[in-house]
Swiss-Prot record:
This is Putative protein kinase C delta type homolog. Keywords: ATP-binding, Kinase, Metal-binding, Nucleotide-binding, Phosphoprotein, Repeat, Serine/threonine-protein kinase, Transferase, Zinc, Zinc-finger. It catalyses: L-seryl-[protein] + ATP = O-phospho-L-seryl-[protein] + ADP + H(+); L-threonyl-[protein] + ATP = O-phospho-L-threonyl-[protein] + ADP + H(+). Residues 602-671 form the AGC-kinase C-terminal domain. The active site is at 467 (proton acceptor). Residues 14-27 have a biased composition (Low complexity). Coiled coil: none annotated. A zinc finger (Phorbol-ester/DAG-type) spans 144-194, 216-266. One of its GO terms (biological process) is flight. The gene is Pkcdelta.
Length: 671
């Protein structure tokens, strides 16, 4: 016997004991969102039918993964939260007659006269497992092209230099609009605009106006007697007869499907033109910057040091200026570099697609650290080299704040990257939520205040965190929090600067990220609102049977606020989960006011909090430094070893991309 998704969902809902109780009218109102009703009361039939059609259309619309950034999660008609809430209560209590007058069924509740479902309340979902973050593939925008790193399953040639794309993993870049394939080193040298770009419908406007180049190819169908590759997309042209097109003038070959996408560069050698232009620019720059006086006497002339040396010197000098430096018994040498041989690995603390987190001991000492081990081939394959270097920078910066995870050092081998961080043996908040169900308001307030302190520190440095969740908030042995995992951070977001990357954990994503809009640090306050909701209530505020339905819920529904939480807690949750980011409570510059001034945090003495002088409401019962009771036993029972990488893949990796990763934090001392 076959069942529809709606019937299965209804059966699961009726059997679930973890969901909050609802009246019969509310349950019917929730179900009308997903299924068609063959029978309906008078005055409600047309409304419910319209709702079913709208819901079906919505599901069809979300099957396409390209809906991100097109506002597909918005409803045609929006109402305020209070308006929607009171309207639903009135419609459920008003009976059939009121439904006839307004176009809303007595039991339908959330269906407008136009047949569009606008019920803004959602049923919470219990937190049963960990949720991983997602990140859309990084794009490189050059001349209208949107290049992404890609793995090519067949021999492919570069459209710029006409050389073969070698290597394992993702060998080159391909434009997702016009399918042009190039090397990573060649993608920023293309002269022609993307022929499918939104900036122009003609691919040669820039060349025609600036370089006076507008030479269309004269393509003719051609039968190739040997294997031939397309000069546009780089792939093999298959078939036995008339496999593609060939230009009569310059012998450029392409698929029939690539003809309209090929730039008008007949007889033009892009590589030679780019080299000539670079030579001219280099000569002009050298003439402009050549000093008339010796470098030491010319204040405009600077000699830039390497990135790593500059950062270490800067942070060390800033630390000395703070006046809080006390000479310990033993100080880490300022430029000492550590290696994998300096540590003894003891246990596995966590594991993921990125690699592992291992508990390790510094040899000849009694100091223990958590070492995050990343496989280089995975980092390169996901094009996450920049994210890895950003994580190292933020971790080094976090040493200056008491509620951010502290970095000891970083080093690398041929196959792995290593982050040596402080060992926080109190577990993460996800572990404690699953153990306790939910936190008391006092405990949630304390954790929330320390998280706010850490977020404000990052925001003042122009950093968007973008991955705040229960899994990334850890407890130390005293019970204070530490924010960890900075791989999703975005740097240099000051004043009116914004970001637009689609990344984060789906349950914690702000509506503006889902809709593809530009955003700033306000997305972190939305994520904090979701996290605070989960700490106070023990459930996620938004739910959906799949990712698309979850995103629709986040953008259009309001969460349920139970009666057992205080009015102050309800007020701050509503302020944080405000869908209009301009009205969302958060930083001191927000029109809604500084979150630290909210009545919910009135019992907090922020001065004492910054000094870690407030007693935590919960202290982990850690018996000894190697106690791993607050970590998942599935991991701690595993054998401690690093996953090896294939020798051929290892030999093909470009190690230069990880230059500058090795670092020793001058702030950390051994007492």
């Amino acid at each position: 016997m076959m069942f529809t998704r709606a019937q299965v969902r209804k059966q699961k809902t009726s059997n679930s004991s973890s969901q909050r109780p609802r009246s019969s009218g509310g349950s019917t109102r929730h179900e009308t969102r997903y299924k068609q009703s063959s029978t309906s009361s008078s005055g409600a039939g047309s409304g419910l039918s319209g709702a079913s059609g709208a819901s079906g259309a919505r599901r069809d619309q979300y099957r396409d993964r390209d809906h991100y950034g097109k506002h597909s999660f918005e409803l045609p008609r929006q109402h305020s939260k209070e308006e929607a809430y009171h309207r639903d209560r009135e419609s459920s209590a008003g009976g059939v007659d009121r439904g006839e007058r307004s176009g809303i069924g007595g039991n339908g509740g959330g269906v407008t006269g136009g047949g569009v479902y606008v019920d803004r309340r959602t049923r919470p979902r219990s937190i049963t497992n960990r949720r991983g973050a997602i990140k859309h593939q990084k794009t490189h925008d050059i001349n209208g092209h949107r290049f992404v790193a890609k793995f090519f399953r067949q021999p492919t040639f570069c459209a710029f230099c006409n050389l073969f794309l070698w290597g394992f993993g993702k060998q080159g870049y391909q434009c997702i609009i016009c399918q042009t394939v190039v090397h990573k080193k060649c993608h920023d040298k293309l002269l022609g605009k993307c022929s499918g770009s939104v900036f122009t419908s003609a691919s040669t406007i820039l060349l025609r106006e600036r370089f006076k180049i507008d030479m269309p190819h004269r393509f003719k169908p051609h039968t190739f007697m040997s294997p031939t590759f397309c000069d546009h997309c780089g792939s093999l042209m298959g078939g036995f007869f008339i496999q593609g097109l060939k230009c009569e003038e310059c012998d450029v070959n392409c698929h029939k499907k690539c003809e309209r996408l090929t730039a008008n560069l007949c007889g033009v050698n892009q590589k030679l033109i780019v080299e000539a232009l670079n030579h001219v620019k280099r000569g002009a720059r050298e003439a402009r910057d050549s000093p008339s006086t010796p470098p030491s006497l010319n204040p405009a002339y600077k000699i830039e040091a390497s990135e790593e040396h500059d950062e270490t010197s800067y942070t060390y000098s800033q630390f000395q200026k703070s006046g809080r430096f006390t000479a310990p018994a033993t100080v880490i040498p300022r430029f000492k570099n550590y290696s994998v041989d300096d540590f003894h690995f003891l246990a596995v603390l966590g594991k993921g697609s990125f690699g592992k987190v291992l508990l390790a001991e510094l040899r000849d000492t009694t100091y223990y650290y958590a070492i995050k081990c990343l496989k280089k081939d995975v980092v390169l394959e996901d094009d996450d080299v920049d994210s890895t270097l950003i994580e190292r920078k933020v971790l080094a910066l976090g040493t200056k704040h008491p509620y951010l995870c502290h970095l000891f050092c970083t080093f690398q081998t041929e196959s792995h990257l290593f982050f040596v961080m402080e060992y926080l043996n109190g577990g993460d908040l996800m572990f404690h939520i699953q153990e306790s169900g939910r936190f008391s308001e006092e405990r949630a307030r304390f954790y929330g205040a320390e998280i706010i302190s850490g977020l404000k520190f990052l925001h003042k440095k122009g950093i968007i965190y973008r991955d705040l969740k229960l899994d990334n908030v850890l407890l130390d042995y005293e019970g204070h929090v530490r924010i960890a995992d900075f791989g999703m951070c975005k740097l240099q977001i000051y004043l009116d600067k914004t970001a637009d990357s689609f990344c984060g954990t789906p349950d914690y994503m702000a509506p503006e990220i889902i809709k593809g809009e530009k955003y700033n640090q306000n997305v972190d306050w939305w994520s904090f609102g979701v996290l605070l909701y989960e700490m106070l209530i023990g459930q996620s505020p938004f739910s959906g049977c799949d990712e698309d339905e979850l995103f629709w819920s986040i953008c259009n529904e309001i969460p349920w606020f139970p009666v057992y939480i205080s009015a102050e807690a309800t007020g701050i949750l509503k302020g944080l989960l405000e869908k209009d980011y301009t009205k969302r409570i958060g930083s001191q510059y927000s029109p809604a006011g500084d979150i630290a001034d909210h009545i919910f945090f009135r019992p907090i003495d922020w001065g004492l909090l910054e000094k870690r002088q407030i007693e935590p409401p919960f202290k982990p019962q850690v018996k000894h430094p190697l106690d791993t009771q607050y970590f998942d036993r599935v991991f701690t029972r595993e054998r401690v070893r690093l996953t090896p990488i294939d020798k051929e893949i290892l030999a093909s990796m470009d190690q230069k991309q990880f230059h500058g990763f090795t670092y020793t934090n001058p702030h950390i001392t051994l007492d």
